[in-house]
Curated annotation (Swiss-Prot):
The gene is rnhB. GO terms for cellular component: cytoplasm; ribonuclease H2 complex. One of its GO terms (molecular function) is RNA-DNA hybrid ribonuclease activity. It is an enzyme of class 3 (hydrolase). It comes from Rickettsia africae (strain ESF-5). It is found in: Cytoplasm. This is Ribonuclease HII. Keywords: Cytoplasm, Endonuclease, Hydrolase, Manganese, Metal-binding, Nuclease.
Length: 193
C-alpha cells in the first residue's frame, strides 16, 4: 500500500505548512544542518521521498528541483556549537532558525521525529520523512547541503574520507582518527575511539 505523502499537508489544508528535517545528528565531524521546505501543492515534484532512500544522483537532481520550485531555507550549526550546547539542542536551534529564515511564514511546521519545541506551530511526526512530502523534501535539501559541506572540508582533510563518509563513524574514519588524531572539525563531545 502506497503512503499518501500529502496526508499531513492536506490535514492542514487551510494553513501554510512547512516541513523540516535535519542531517548530521550522528556524525563524528562537521555541522548539523536543518532545512525547511514549503511545498507548492499545485506543483508536486515526483520522486520526492526520504533522502536516505535515494541515490546520491537522484538526491542532487531533486535538490535542484526543490530549491528551484519551492520556498525553502537552511540553517547550519557548527561542530563547536554542537559541543557547547549538545546535539539535541543544536538540532532544535537549527530547525528553529531554518523556519525563521523562510521567506513565507508557516502556520504549521511538520517536524521529523519526536523533538518537542516551545513554538506551538511545530508538530512532531515520528517517521515523518516517510509520511510527509514537505519533510521528505526538507530531508533532501538538508542532506545534500551537508554532504556538499563535508565534501569541501574533505579537500582540506582528505585523510578522513569525508567525501565518502560525510563525517560518520565508519571503520575507515575511525582508523584515520586513530592515526592522525582529531581534526579541527571533529566534535569533541562525541566519543568514538
Amino acid at each position: 500500500m502506497e503512503v499518501d505523502l500529502l496526508h499531513f499537508e492536506k490535514k492542514y489544508h487551510n494553513c501554510i505548512v512547512a516541513g523540516i528535517d535535519e542531517a548530521g545528528r550522528g556524525p563524528l565531524a562537521g555541522p548539523v544542518v536543518a532545512s525547511a521546505v514549503i511545498v507548492d501543492n499545485a506543483n508536486i515534484i515526483t520522486g520526492i521521498k526520504d533522502s536516505k532512500k535515494l541515490s546520491k544522483k537522484k538526491r542532487e537532481l531533486l535538490y535542484e528541483q526543490i530549491t528551484s520550485n519551492y520556498v525553502w531555507a537552511t540553517a547550519i550549526i557548527s561542530h563547536t556549537e554542537i559541543d557547547d550546547i549538545n546535539i539535541l539542542e543544536a538540532t532544535k536551534k537549527a530547525c528553529s532558525i531554518a523556519v525563521a529564515n523562510l521567506s513565507l511564514e508557516p502556520e504549521i511546521v511538520l517536524v521529523d521525529g519526536n523533538m518537542q519545541f516551545k513554538d506551538e506551530r511545530f508538530v512532531s511526526i515520528i517517521n515523518g520523512d516517510n509520511l510527509s512530502l514537505s519533510i521528505a523534501a526538507a530531508s533532501i535539501v538538508a542532506k545534500v547541503t551537508r554532504d556538499r559541506l563535508m565534501l569541501d572540508l574533505s579537500a582540506e582533510f582528505p585523510q578522513y574520507l569525508w567525501h565518502k563518509n560525510s563525517g560518520y563513524g565508519t571503520k575507515e574514519h575511525i582508523e584515520a582518527i586513530n592515526i592522525y588524531g582529531l581534526s579541527p572539525y571533529h566534535r569533541r563531545s562525541f566519543r568514538c575511539c
